[in-house]
Amino acid sequence: MKVKFENPHGAIAEEIEARFETFVEGVNEKVAKYYAEKFPTLDPEHVVVSPSGRTYWKLIKEKKENPETGQRFVYGFVRKADGAIFKAASWNAPFTKGPTAIRGYVTDESNGMDAARVHGIIYAV
């Protein structure tokens, strides 16, 4: 049986995708500001979206200058159906267990930025 997910704010797919793009831009701004203030001599990191994935957008954090030589890790996941934001359980999957699995929505008033931290999606709600 396939489960249907609905956005609690009544957003449609096009709006979710647009808000997701804004969310990624906001995360990158937050990370860039952190690196500029705390580590101005280091290569900055940024968050990119993995091109594959039927159910989730995977956000990957990597070095901006040389992504192929630097370390990469999963920043978090966003479900395409409803814009729900999840922390990463592993490289391949989000943490979806329990009532507190969803950390926020990209359609929230904050555009999901309340769930975003410099190093990844907020761990505890």
Model-derived segments and their meaning:
Residues 82-112:
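A short, surface-exposed interaction/processing loop segment used at functional sites
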Residues 10-11, 37, 44, 58, ...:
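Accessory DNA-engaging acidic/polar modules
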Residues 43-76:
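Exposed beta-strand-loop-beta-strand "reactive/processing" segments of non-cytosolic proteins
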Residues 5-42:
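Short, non-transmembrane alpha-helical segments in secretory-pathway proteins
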Residues 13-16, 27-28, 32, 49-50, ...:
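Short linear sequence motifs
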Residues 78-80:
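Short, acidic, Ser/Thr-enriched surface-loop or helix-capping motifs
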